[in-house]
């Protein structure tokens, strides 16, 4: 009898111990992105600070460690040495005032940078301080700093640096250094007087990162501001400042350290329904010279998954003159090439509609990069069916020649051919598709959720001939060690 009781106790103890452990994350679930960043578990929203330091790309992101729904927002943390493979870190920033409320004093997206000159005076030893500015919901704009590259964090004792104002909905502080004026600049989303007509970005300046002076306000923008100076056609004597907002729009202009002066109409960088709140990495070395952007992909439903949300693939930004205009160009960073596995390629294939011939019939998989240059010849439309199956038609990406539009999942992009040709660069992962058209001139980022065995692809054209000048398809490696 004693042995039976003892065995029962051991079984109960083992059951309790097992039940108390978090479920192991295998990174190979049905909808787990294999080469886009996603959290180990629970909800992830938008980027909340991107900074490079000592060979590491650090990413902070909106995160609910309690579940898969939005709320109880903390700032999660991960880093990478190559923008591809990511190491998950402990939660960086917790809600303020010991708040356990779903919304009050929770940590919402902001920005991150390096305090090179120890302006705050918090540096210990040779390691430069990392600084994060963030919105504490209902509790103002706040600051935290780290002595050890983000492993541990201290909140500034004088928080909030900008007090909460119930009449302006202030959020998403973007802090950057403006070299010509030797000032710190903060862009802050605001809705002065709770008037939607006035919502936009306010500009503040500071010498010490603590005391901020209001300078100007630019109406007509919604959340998640960012500002960077880029060369036009890579010419150092011809630059524009690029102001971006949370819904994928941007505007070009000049910036004197206090006021942004628009010099273009508002334009759209990404037309996808899940693209959200882009940010640029700060502190990228001059020897690299790139401006690298990341955005959230939110609004999808990762049903049955231990996580919710993913990021876009990191992109390099540039400005290019096209005809009489200047446009923002987004292209996947070159580091993506290290993920290439098996390659398929075709050149100068003439496709005639109605023959039932699918050039890419043998292609299968759920993680691909598809790059192609297509001469429209006399076709009326062409495109691809992505992730087809025995019982499903897949997701249609189609270019309409007459209308000069590219469409995906109900999102339609105006896109003119160049020399009667369309270029497509498609990043396909288990729960997303990103399309970069005409060498990054336009993009569409959307979440898709297919059945496990839906791994077929169809290249089609209608109304006339299509010349596939060049087509390359790469099977992609997983970035997650646990998924191999």
Predicted regions and their residues:
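Bacterial Sec-dependent signal peptides at the C-terminal "C-region" and cleavage site
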Residues: 3, 7-25
């Amino acid at each position: 009898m004693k042995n039976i009781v003892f065995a029962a106790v051991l079984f109960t103890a083992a059951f309790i111990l097992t039940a108390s452990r978090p479920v192991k994350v295998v990174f190979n679930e049905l909808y787990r992105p294999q080469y886009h960043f996603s959290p180990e578990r629970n909800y992830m929203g938008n980027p909340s600070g991107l900074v490079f330091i000592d060979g590491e790309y650090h990413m902070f992101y909106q995160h609910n460690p309690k579940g898969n729904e939005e709320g109880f927002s903390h700032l999660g943390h991960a880093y990478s040495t190559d923008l591809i493979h990511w190491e998950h870190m402990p939660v960086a920033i917790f809600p303020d005032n010991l708040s356990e409320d779903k919304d009050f004093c929770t940590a919402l997206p902001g920005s991150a940078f390096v305090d090179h000159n120890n302006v705050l005076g918090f540096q210990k030893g040779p390691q430069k301080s990392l600084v994060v500015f963030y919105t504490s919901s209902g509790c103002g704009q706040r600051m935290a700093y780290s002595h050890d590259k983000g492993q541990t964090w201290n909140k500034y004792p004088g928080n909030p640096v900008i007090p909460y104002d119930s009449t302006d909905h202030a959020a998403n502080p973007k802090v950057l250094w403006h070299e010509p004026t030797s000032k710190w600049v903060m862009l802050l989303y605001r809705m002065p007087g709770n008037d939607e007509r006035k919502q936009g970005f306010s500009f503040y300046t500071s010498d010490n990162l603590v005391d901020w002076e209001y300078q100007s306000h630019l109406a007509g923008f919604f959340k998640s501001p960012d500002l960077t100076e880029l060369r036009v056609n890579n010419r150092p004597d011809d630059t524009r400042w690029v102001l971006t907002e949370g819904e994928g729009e941007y505007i070009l202009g000049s910036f004197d350290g206090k006021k942004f002066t628009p010099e273009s109409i508002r334009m759209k960088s990404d037309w996808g329904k899940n693209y959200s709140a882009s940010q640029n990495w700060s502190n990228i070395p001059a020897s690299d010279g790139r401006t690298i952007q990341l955005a959230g992909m939110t609004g999808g439903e990762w049903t049955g998954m231990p996580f919710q949300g993913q990021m876009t693939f990191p992109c390099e930004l540039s400005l290019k003159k096209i005809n009489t205009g200047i446009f923002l160009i987004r292209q996947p960073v070159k580091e993506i090439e290290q993920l290439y596995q098996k390659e398929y390629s075709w050149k100068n294939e003439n496709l005639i509609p109605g023959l039932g011939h699918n050039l890419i019939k043998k292609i299968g998989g759920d993680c691909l990069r598809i790059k192609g240059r297509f001469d429209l010849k006399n076709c009326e439309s062409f495109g691809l069916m992505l992730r087809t199956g025995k019982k499903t038609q897949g997701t249609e990406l189609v270019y309409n020649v007459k209308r000069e539009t590219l469409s995906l999942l109900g999102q339609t992009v105006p896109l003119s051919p160049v020399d009667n040709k369309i270029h497509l660069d498609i990043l396909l992962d288990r729960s997303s598709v990103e399309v970069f058209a005409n060498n990054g001139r336009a993009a569409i980022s959307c979440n898709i959720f297919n059945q496990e065995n839906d791994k077929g692809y169809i290249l089609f054209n209608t109304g006339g001939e299509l010349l596939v000048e060049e087509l390359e398809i790469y099977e992609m490696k997983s970035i997650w060690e646990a998924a191999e």
